[in-house]
Each structure stands twice: as C-alpha cells, then as structure tokens.
C-alpha cells in the first residue's frame, strides 16, 4: 500500500484523535509549488482549529504518537520499522529511521494499514 504524505498525515492524525480535518490548498511563496495543509480539532490534546503536525516529515511530531504506545506496542512498532526498512533495502538501524517510516510503522502497529 503506497500512501502519499498527505494520506499518512491524516491517518496518523485520526489515530491520535483529531477530528473535523479540513484541507487548505495554496501556493508556496518560496517555491511557487502547490501545497496542502490541514486543520482540525484534537479533543484528546485539548486542541481546537489548529494545523495538524507534519507527521511524515517531523520526528518531533512522531514523538507525540510514540509517547502514546504501550510497551508491547513499542516493541511491535520497532519490529515494523525494521521490516519496512528491510523492504526499502535501507541498512540503517530502526532507531535512526526517518519520520515517514515511523508513521507507517505506527499505522501498521495500530492495524490501520496492512
């Protein structure tokens, strides 16, 4: 399953409890390329009408969902990171995995993607 960064961002946000997610399309002032950002509410974090974290590109944002995992899920996620890195033929250890890989492993650990 190949998900875009936007799809990953929304799936992770929904798994974290974000609701009322709305997309905003605009042109990046620096690059001139089209860009999409999302706003939403997150009752579990007591957040209303805020920009969603950029989970696929930010290790700091990944720390939010990693902090919610049980010890068992943390071990499962580590295993899933290793599997994803091997599929990508990426030799780095799991603890150095990029944010996008962590997001995919989180979604897999939560049973939200195969």
What are these regions (language model features)?
Residues 1-114:
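Glycine-rich anion-binding surface patch
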């Amino acid at each position: 399953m190949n998900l875009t960064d936007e799809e990953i961002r929304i799936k992770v946000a929904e798994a974290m409890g974000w609701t009322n997610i709305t997309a905003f399309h605009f042109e990046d002032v620096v690059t001139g390329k089209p860009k999409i950002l999302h706003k939403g509410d997150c009752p579990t974090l007591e957040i209303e009408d805020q920009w969603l974290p950029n989970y696929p590109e930010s290790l700091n944002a990944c720390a939010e969902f990693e902090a919610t995992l049980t010890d068992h899920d943390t071990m499962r996620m580590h295993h899933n990171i290793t599997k994803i890195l091997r599929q990508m033929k990426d030799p780095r250890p799991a603890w150095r995995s990029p944010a996008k890989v962590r997001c995919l492993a989180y979604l897999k650990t939560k049973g939200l993607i195969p």
